[in-house]
Swiss-Prot record:
Pfam families: DNA_pol3_delta2, DNA_pol3_gamma3, DNAX_ATPase_lid. NCBIfam families: dnaX_nterm, PRK05563.1. ATP binds at residues 45-52. Unlike E.coli this gene does not also produce the shortened gamma protein; there is no defined order for DNA clamp loading complex assembly. This is DNA polymerase III subunit tau. The lineage of its organism: Bacteria, Bacillati, Bacillota, Bacilli, Bacillales. It comes from Bacillus subtilis (strain 168). Zn(2+) binds at residues 64, 73, 76, 79.
Length: 563
């Protein structure tokens, strides 16, 4: 058979031909020049990244007649013999089919013999992770102390399956996936050498489908050339790789953003009718939104985009779709992609994901009016406060001239505090309970912010705990309307506050609200009643009961006694 596949014809023959592995080739070249190469190497990495090719190039370089050199000359008898496989001293073994103990024992017995044609005998064991445990054990001693004329190069795609005793005896080099840009650059050289005509963008599609493997890319290129004929077109590359045009993906993405379920399902059906794989299609959508998110957050990093070519349509769509919507779409598509692995009907999961994204977008949009409604309520409260300032505060301004604060006379009170209940709390109130509550108040407000309870936090801005017992506390409000809303449990505010306090303090405490204008009178009445009770008692009082009760409520450090 005269024809050879492109990946065989253009297999790297020098280190400079190995694409995307400069960190490895540079290290090996320096070791060759300084004659400090090891007796055993482990090359690990994804398929098609150059592990076996680098091993054969290294074998040629150490045995080149012009050694020490950093590149094989490919002209001497040793280099040519290793390239065409005629030199028996460079042995390439497939561990997948030679994984038994007997095969490794055969290597162990023959390794002691000196090479016949070149300086070093090189064993290249491909897919070494396929060896059995017994075979690895048989290789241990030879790998640790091989003869001076012998070099082992182990190659694997799954290094985690190799025993640590083997890995510790080798110099390990990890081959990385080749970038799409590097693959395209290599394919451009190949099509120029083959004098092939390719349409702009077709090589990028093939490189993207290769998933970082140069051999996969060249195999796809070979297939696409055979299919296309004279000119390799973008449509041919899309058809061969099973990829989807960015035009279709952008159209589907726009339908999802516009919440147009009908157009989205129609576009999806059109793509599936063309024979596109649902799993591959949903993966392309995930990468499309991923690239859009990166471009949106860091426009200068176009080099990190995997699948997308930044055009005018992509730019416009990235400006229209908010980042939060991209997060949600990526999350939904990723979950559906995982679920596709366990079903015989992947199309259904894709269609459900499309409908769910559109509905989620509707729900996200519906959340905005709720925020607007809360903001309107806050504005209404602020307007009510301003109205109270103009109608009620003027009358209250005269209260400092009186002996005790009174309820404003500017109008009838809409809320009357539960005096009896407040008196009961004051009888049981203690300073430690009040201090505990006040110290926890900041955490309570922070918790409300985490809950997104904007209206609840607004009600507590001008409130203050003034008395607390073991099972209830009194909360003073600057504005009567705030006190009334809490007492009536509007929007569940009182219930929510009591639940938060219970989770923080470990005990339930009932909230009793009192307006600031009424609090002074209620407290004064309680102190007077308590003083009369103490005066009617037969027990002598060592301290003025009024002062004692005041100390109990607000603390002795805040009391100043004047004769």
């Amino acid at each position: 058979m005269s024809y050879q596949a492109l990946y065989r014809v253009f297999r790297p023959q020098r280190f400079e031909d190995v694409v995307g592995q400069e960190h490895i080739t540079k290290t090996l070249q320096n070791a060759l020049l300084q004659k400090k190469f090891s007796h055993a190497y482990l090359f690990s990495g994804p398929r098609g990244t150059g592990k076996t090719s680098a091993a054969k190039i290294f074998a040629k370089a150490v045995n080149c007649e012009h050694a020490p050199v950093d590149e094989p000359c490919n002209e001497c008898a040793a280099c040519k013999g290793i390239t065409n496989g005629s030199i028996s001293d460079v042995i390439e073994i497939d561990a997948a089919s030679n994984n038994g103990v007997d095969e490794i024992r055969d290597i162990r017995d023959k390794v002691k013999f000196a090479p016949s044609a070149v300086t070093y005998k090189v064993y290249i064991i491909d897919e070494v992770h396929m060896l059995s445990i017994g075979a690895f054990n048989a290789l241990l001693k030879t790998l640790e102390e091989p003869p001076e004329h012998c070099i082992f190069i182990l190659a694997t795609t799954e290094p985690h399956k190799i025993p640590l005793t083997i890995i510790s005896r080798c110099q390990r080099f990890d081959f990385k996936r080749i970038t799409s840009q590097a693959i395209v650059g290599r394919m451009n050289k190949i099509v120029d050498a083959e004098q092939l005509q390719v349409e702009e963008g077709s090589l990028e599609i093939i490189a993207s489908a290769a998933d970082g493997g140069m051999r996969d890319a060249l195999s796809l290129l070979d297939q696409a050339i055979s299919f296309s004929g004279d000119i390799l077109k973008v449509e041919d590359a899309l058809l061969i790789t099973g990829a989807v045009s960015q035009l279709y993906i952008g159209k589907l993405a726009k339908s999802l953003h516009d919440k147009n379920v009908s157009d989205a399902l129609e576009t999806l059906n059109e793509l599936l009718q063309q024979g596109k794989d649902p799993a591959k299609l949903i993966e392309d959508m995930i990468f499309y939104f991923r690239d859009m998110l990166l471009y949106k957050t860091a426009p200068g990093l176009e080099g990190v985009l995997e699948k997308v070519k930044v055009d005018e349509t992509f730019r416009e769509l990235s400006e229209q779709i908010p980042a939060q919507a991209l997060y949600e779409m990526i999350d939904i598509l990723n979950k559906s992609h995982q679920e596709m692995k366990w079903t015989n009907h992947p199309r259904i999961f894709f269609e459900v994901a499309v409908v769910k994204i559109c509905q989620t977008s509707h729900q996200s949009a519906a959340d905005l009016p709720e925020v607007d409604m809360l903001m309107k309520k806050i504005q209404q409260l602020e307007q009510e406060v301003e109205r109270l300032k103009t109608t009620g505060i003027k009358a209250a301004a005269e209260s400092p001239k009186k002996e005790a604060p009174r309820v404003p006379k500017g109008g009838k009170s809409n809320y009357k505090a539960p005096v009896g209940r407040i008196h009961e709390i004051l009888k049981e109130a203690t300073r430690p309970d009040l201090d505990l509550l006040r110290n926890s108040w900041g955490k309570l407000l922070a918790h409300l912010k985490q809950q997104n309870k904007v209206s609840h936090a607004a009600l507590l801005n001008d409130s203050e705990p003034v008395a607390a017992g073991s099972a209830a506390f009194v909360l003073k409000f600057k504005y009567e309307i705030h006190c009334k809303m809490v007492a009536e449990d509007n929007n569940g505010v009182r219930t929510n506050l009591e639940q938060i306090l219970e989770s923080m303090l470990g005990k339930r405490m009932d909230l009793i609200g009192v307006p600031e204008a009424q609090w002074g009178k209620i407290r004064e009445e309680f102190l007077e009643d308590h003083q009369q009770e103490n005066e009617g008692s037969n027990e002598p009082a060592e301290e003025d009961p009024l002062i004692a009760e005041a100390k109990k409520l607000v603390g002795a450090d805040l009391i100043e006694i004047k004769d």
